Curated annotation (Swiss-Prot):
Cofactor: Fe(2+)
Record organism: Nitrosomonas europaea (strain ATCC 19718 / CIP 103999 / KCTC 2705 / NBRC 14298)
Protein name from the UniProt record: Peptide deformylase 1
Tagged with keyword Cell cycle: no
Gene behind the chain: def1
Annotated catalytic residues: E142
Length: 176
């Protein structure tokens, strides 16, 4: 079921999410289906459970040849629960980000260029991946939601944060 996405300013988005302790439950399966339906309906690159009002450490993400990210490499669809991120470099790169919880806006956000993420999938099986580039950026963005962090909190220069139609006049860039 498609759920409404909470917007920046909602206190639920600023709270740390709780760990998932039980796997294979009807409640977890329903949450994951709702998240997938919502992300697909909004053409998102990812979605965190807190964005639909559920304070659990659950994120989903995945991008395949999206017109919204024409230059981005594909990111395999992933369900990631109770994630732990470990930067594998001190090198950071700034790039433009948007968010379904902050429609119509973009900001230049620094992110680690290479990291390892670990967690579990919907069945409780271990996930352990090392990623770079856009994949690393998407994982960091989604996992920030689990710690009550929205991307504007990471921006170094607020002159590089604004409305999409003002920052990129004449370009068609969908809301994230």
């Amino acid at each position: 079921m498609i759920k409404p996405v909470l917007k920046m300013g909602d206190p639920c988005l600023l709270q740390p999410a709780r760990r998932v302790d039980q796997f294979g439950t009807p409640e977890l399966e329903a949450l994951l289906q709702d998240m997938q339906d919502t992300m697909a309906a909004l053409n998102g690159a990812g979605l965190a459970a807190p964005q639909i009002g559920v304070s659990l450490q659950v994120v989903i993400f995945g991008v395949e040849h999206s017109p919204r990210y024409p230059d981005a490499e594909s990111v395999p669809f992933t369900v990631l629960i109770n994630p732990v991120l470990t930067p594998l470099t001190e090198q950071m790169e700034e790039d433009w980000e948007g968010c379904l919880s902050i429609p119509g806006m973009r900001g230049l956000v620094p992110r680690y260029t290479r990291l390892r993420y670990q967690g579990v999938d919907a069945a409780g099986a271990s996930i352990d991946r090392t990623v770079t580039g856009f994949h690393a950026r998407v994982v960091q963005h989604e996992c920030d939601h689990l710690n009550g962090i929205l991307y504007p909190m990471r921006i170094n220069d607020l002159r590089k944060f604004g409305y999409t139609d003002t920052l990129f006049p004449g370009q068609t860039i969908a809301d994230d």
